From Swiss-Prot:
FMN phosphoryl threonine PTM sites in chain numbering: T187
Subunit and interaction comment: The complex is composed of six subunits: RnfA, RnfB, RnfC, RnfD, RnfE and RnfG.
Annotated keywords: Cell inner membrane, Cell membrane, Electron transport, Flavoprotein, FMN, Membrane, Phosphoprotein, Translocase, Transmembrane, Transmembrane helix, Transport
Protein name: Ion-translocating oxidoreductase complex subunit D
GO CC entries: plasma membrane
Subcellular location: Cell inner membrane
Membrane topology: Multi-pass membrane protein
InterPro entries from the UniProt entry: NqrB/RnfD (IPR004338), RnfD_bac (IPR011303)
Record organism: Vibrio cholerae serotype O1 (strain ATCC 39315 / El Tor Inaba N16961)
Amino acid sequence: MAFFIASSPHLRSKRSTADVMRWVLACALPGLIAQTYFFGYGTLIQLLLAISVAVALEAGIMLLRKRSPISALRDYSAVVTAWLLAVAIPPLSPWWVVVIGLIFAIVIAKHLYGGLGQNPFNPAMIAYVVLLISFPVQMTSWMAPIKLTAEPSSLVDSFSLIFGGFDSDGLSLQQIRTGIDGITMATPLDAFKTSLKAGHTMSETLTQPQFSGFAGIGWEWVNIAYLLGGLILLKLRIIRWHIPMAMLAGLVFTALLAQLFAPGTTASPMIHLLSGATMLGAFFIATDPVSASTTDKGRLIYGFFIGAMVFLIRSWGGFPDGVAFAVLLANMCVPLIDYYTKPRTYGH
C-alpha cells in the first residue's frame, strides 16, 4: 500500500494568503471612504500612487531574486502594505514621500529578510517611522477636515499639490495651511497635547474648532469606519480577537489610570479611542500575522503592550500619534513573548 508523504502543517485553512489579503482590503474600504470624505481626494491619489509603486517594486525585486513576479503579486501583500502606508500619511504629501516609504517597506523591511512570512517588523510601519523621522514637516502637514475649510482642495488641486507642489492658484501646501484663519492644522491629538502643555484645561481645549462632541471632527468617523471593518474581519475569522481587544484595553486602561492619578493632564479614553490611527492600528496593523505574537497568551500581552505604549507616546512622546512606534517596539518583543508563552507540550 502506498502512502503520501507531506511536511507539516497537515491541517490547513481553506483560505489562501490572497483570500485573506483581499478580505483585509475589502474591510478597509469603509475607512478609506471616510478619510476621503473628510480629508479630500488626496487620500485616493496617494493610494493609487502607492499601489502602483508597490507593485513595480515587488515585481522588480522578484525578478532580481530570479523568482516569478506574477506569483508574488497574486498574494496581494504588496497592495496591503501600500494601502496601509497611503492612508497613514497626510493626503497632500509630496509624491516622493510615498515612493521613498515603499522602497523601505518592500525592499528593506520585507525582501531583505527573505520576503513574505520572514519579516520580523511590519513593513508599512517601518516605512512610516522612517518617513516621520526623516521628513517631519511633510509627514505632519495634515489639512483640517473639509467641514472646517471654506474652499476644500479640488481633485485637480490635490493632484497638483501632490505632484507639483502648488495648486492652481500657485499656492504651496504650507501657504494653504497657514491661510486658514482661526483653525489649527494640527491633528486633534497634537492639538490636545499642545493645549494642555500651554496650561489650558480640558474643557477649554475641547472648545477648539477641530473637536466635536466626543473626539476630533472627521477622525472619530474614520475610526468608527475602521472599527466596522475590523469587526467584519473578526466575524469572518480573518483575524482573532486577542490582539485588537487587548490593544484597546491597554489604551483605555492606561488612559483611565492617568485620569485617576493626574486628572486634566491627558486626553480622555474616548479621545484616544477615536483619534489618530487607533482602530486602523488595532484591527489592520497590529494583527499582521507575520510580525505579531503566535500564542493566544502572547497575543494578549503583545496587544496590551501596544495599547499602553500608544498612550505613553501620545501623552509624553515627541510625536502626536504613537501607533507605528508602539507596533515596532512590540515586534521587537515578539520572540521573547513567544518564548515565555508557548503552550506546554503534551507529556512534558
